[in-house]
Every structure is written in structure tokens, then in C-alpha cells.
């Protein structure tokens, strides 16, 4: 599509962001450093300072609208989340992970910049995104298909969000940026709707893609074995100056409930998932079979 102009730059450099946003009417600020394995300074530079650069570029060019992609992890305090609304989720006093802390700082700055006259902003946050080209969530589980085991009892429930449902939420976010909108300066979570059992969701992915069922393997005790092991890995990593993939944060995310009430997004943004779970999985499965498996299919 010749209407799309590609620009490669560094989000941490103000001059690059200024050049990329010149001529825009609305910015969807989606770029972020994600995953739990980077250094604190890198998270801060991209997710906080990068957002400040986007705000500055918007003001420089007179861009009045910005939709920020945030994360529900900015509200995680470590406990179960069972059907809570956004209004019931506060920024925690202590963050579980550097990524969440940096995203929260960026989101706060973006919402503070909204004055409802010269600049309008809203934060839209998907939870556990999956779909074609997913190289973070499903990829990291599937690549370890042979050795992965269920953590805990395997009954924990989460919300997931198909990537096109997420994109739909972002588009609706832009439409809600106008004077007097109830969405201004607000944080909304978008999901596929009904929550799922995390390990059932993963097990279906494994079986449909030709890997052994997780439910047929022995389970690993979560809080009494995997969590202490994760803390041990953290300690060793600190001494060695490196990060292991097994962290207390990642173990906790595999054990707790994380599902949300999305009525606020429905009411204020008009959000409804545009793909059903079955439709979403069909598209996801096709990509993983046709593109992902030929490259990564052997697993570990």
C-alpha cells in the first residue's frame, strides 16, 4: 500500500521520533521493550523516555491525538485478579517487574499530558496477546514443548486477546478522543471476552500443533518448588550478572488468576471482540503450522 510510509528510527532519540511523526494527525504509540529479560535501564529508556519523546513530538507538530498501548501488568500486585474492572486496579506501591514499572511511568506521563483541549490521549491494554507472528507468548511455550510441564494444579484462569481484537480496541481508542469524551486519560483492558484456563489454552495449542499433551505429563509443584527455584535462579543470575528465563515474576504469572471485566471498554469505547476464540485460534494455528513449525518445530 503506497499510502504507508515506513520510517526506521530509535524511540530513545528525540530527533528520530520528531521525524517519524511529522505530518501525523493521530499517533498509536505501540512501540515498547517487552518481556521480562532485559535490563532496567533499557526498559526505562524505551518505555518511559520513549513515551516522553512521543509526547514532545506530538506537541511540536501539533498532533492532538495519541492512543497508547499499555499493559495490565502495570496494575499487578502479585495476587489473583478475578474479574476486576479497570477502576478496581490501582498502580501498585511496588512493581513486580521492571517492564511493568517502566510502562506505568510512560502511561502516567501520556495521561498527564491530556488536557482535553490541545491534546487527547487514552491507554488501551490487551492481556496476553496471541495470533499470527506471535514470537513472545505462544512461541516461548511451544519452543520448549518437549520439556515444559504444568506449574501448580493447572486450574488458574486468565484473559487472552487475539491480536486483531487488540487492534480493533486501538482503533476504537482513537475514535474516543474528542472533547468531553469519557475515555480521556483512562485505561482500558481489551480481551477476547470469556476467560480461559491458561493450561487448557496451552494444551490445545500443543495438541493441535502435534506436540504431546501437557495434561498427560506430571505437574511441577508451583509455590513450593518452582517459586523457590526461581528465586535461586535470580540469586545466581545476580552474582553472574545475567538473567535467567525462570524468574519469580514469570512463575507467578503461570500460577495466579489474571482475568478481567471489560465492561468499561464496551461502554466507553464500544468494544466487542470482532473474532471469536474459534476464529482466532484457526488463524493462529494456520500461521504456526505454515510458518513457525518449519523453522522452530522440533522444539526443546
Q: What are these language model-derived features?
A:
Residues 3-4, 8-49, 57, 75-78:
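NAD(P)H-binding glycine-rich loop region in Rossmannoid oxidoreductase-like domains
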Residues 45, 80-129, 149-155:
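Catalytic helix-loop patch of NAD(P)-dependent Rossmann-fold dehydrogenases
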Residues 49-99:
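Conserved Rossmann-fold NAD(P)-dependent oxidoreductase catalytic core, especially the SDR/UDP-sugar
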Residues 96-97, 127-135, 153-165, 191-194:
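Glycine-rich "substrate-gating" loop/helix at the edge of Rossmann-like oxidoreductase active sites
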Residues 113, 142-149, 158-211:
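Alpha-helical substrate-binding/gating segment
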Residues 207-255:
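Terminal hydrophobic/aromatic helix or amphipathic segment near a protein terminus
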Residues 260-268, 272-300:
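Amphipathic terminal alpha-helices
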